[in-house]
């Protein structure tokens, strides 16, 4: 006989939803009808996660907590470059987190920001620049160790994948948007490099990206990324909007997104991991996700004490800006 708990612990969120609908509609029939319909839709359109054994091969490839170099280790080398990938491998990282974006002519490249201003000697929006134009820029220009990394170029997705595989690094693909273009580009590299199925994971803040990736290829390991209050506040905790009403609206949206991420979207997408901002992770939090068969990966863990806590106490892998020393986080 089917049990709620066997379906990933959905009894809690659907019971809560039913109670809310009962209070709002005052109609048991309508509340039950809506809740039941939503559940059937969820079951119909959700994806099964990849087998846990293969997911663990990606998330803990050495059968222990993994340290993942954020943007290749943005404190130790220019972020999202081949030099950063090589440096991360040299410094003992188990893997690298890399940001996927696109040029004006549709070439998939590594870049975190929507503009090239912060990391290069150029200016302008990435979506307005062709690959030929961005290839002339120096991605090490504004890095603190710029003199140690001459002649760096903004790499293509394919170049980065080949470099990671050459160093036996697990890849965390952080997809910023462009669900259709991103999944198409990723599918091509998975087909060219089948080894990626066992040593990479596709991650995004945007559930539609992960859902589209699972639609495109259900064998790809995936993860949702989440930071509470991300819609209403910046990474350093500042409100995004000056208008009280607009800020309040986005706070409400944050509450809805947070509930959906923790109760519905992980199941809909069939993810294997949940990448959470470190300040909101506790032993109980890790335990609750583990009960659902999902691994928690923390970001961004940048001090020796924090790393020791994750390694020895929580047993959770983490993403860090530096493999060598304490540093302030990059948002």
UniProtKB/Swiss-Prot annotation:
Residues 24-254 are lumenal. It catalyses: sn-glycero-3-phospho-1D-myo-inositol + H2O = myo-inositol + sn-glycerol 3-phosphate + H(+); 1-O-(1Z-octadecenyl)-sn-glycero-3-phospho-(N-5Z,8Z,11Z,14Z-eicosatetraenoyl)-ethanolamine + H2O = 1-O-(1Z-octadecenyl)-sn-glycero-3-phosphate + N-(5Z,8Z,11Z,14Z-eicosatetraenoyl)-ethanolamine + H(+); 1-O-(1Z-octadecenyl)-sn-glycero-3-phospho-(N-9Z-octadecenoyl)-ethanolamine + H2O = 1-O-(1Z-octadecenyl)-sn-glycero-3-phosphate + N-(9Z-octadecenoyl) ethanolamine + H(+); 1-O-(1Z-octadecenyl)-sn-glycero-3-phospho-N-hexadecanoyl-ethanolamine + H2O = 1-O-(1Z-octadecenyl)-sn-glycero-3-phosphate + N-hexadecanoylethanolamine + H(+). The gene is GDE1. It comes from Bos taurus (Bovine). Keywords: Cell membrane, Cytoplasmic vesicle, Glycoprotein, Hydrolase, Lipid metabolism, Magnesium, Membrane, Metal-binding, Transmembrane, Transmembrane helix. This is Glycerophosphodiester phosphodiesterase 1. It is a multi-pass membrane protein. It holds the Pfam family GDPD. GO terms for biological process: ethanolamine metabolic process; N-acylethanolamine metabolic process; phospholipid metabolic process. GO terms for molecular function: glycerophosphodiester phosphodiesterase activity; glycerophosphoinositol glycerophosphodiesterase activity; lysophospholipase activity; metal ion binding. Residues 65-331 form the GP-PDE domain. The lineage of its organism: Eukaryota, Metazoa, Chordata, Craniata, Vertebrata.
